[in-house]
Amino acid sequence: MDDKVTNILLSGVGGQGAILASNILAHVFVEAGYDVKKSEVHGMAQRGGDVTTHFRYGKKVYSPLIKYGDVHFLLAFELLEAYRYINYCRNDAKIVINDQKILPPAVNLGQMKYPENIPGTFRKFFDGRVHVIKGQEMALKLGNAQAANVVLVGAFSNFFPEIKDAKWKSALKDLLPQKIHELNFKAFDEGKKAFQE
């Protein structure tokens, strides 16, 4: 293990399960022997406000906050929330974006326009390192839209081949009620597969 600290930013909208996803990551990376620090910033999370988690891991991490322009990995649960943090990403950043639009109140009130073709904008700057996943759609096919966050975690896990699937599934087992284990194992597998297609 070298001294490098890796920075992951998770961004989403309240109710999408972004915080649970960051807890899954924390569980996995601690189990893999890393020091982990994370910091959550909630807008009006319960009302569909933004939710952002700064997540850092390495041999020794001193601060949970990621500097502007220093994100190695972005996991975005909603298109506009991805766009909001595009400038936080390093030039070599790797990105997973959920292909879902949740219109903020300002758009609904006609005060702002929702940006067009957000995935295209990301591809222009991070060519070949942007993976757009239909997390919501895939979770619905499995029978529960709430599993979209685990679909995205499954896709995101592809960036860390050194961490075996068993570790990710162990985190799901420890953090989720038993009655939804099987659903979430399937959601994880589907996300992992969708990333590779």
Regions found by a protein language model. Give the residues of each.
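Active-site cofactor/cluster-binding pocket
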Residues: 1-197
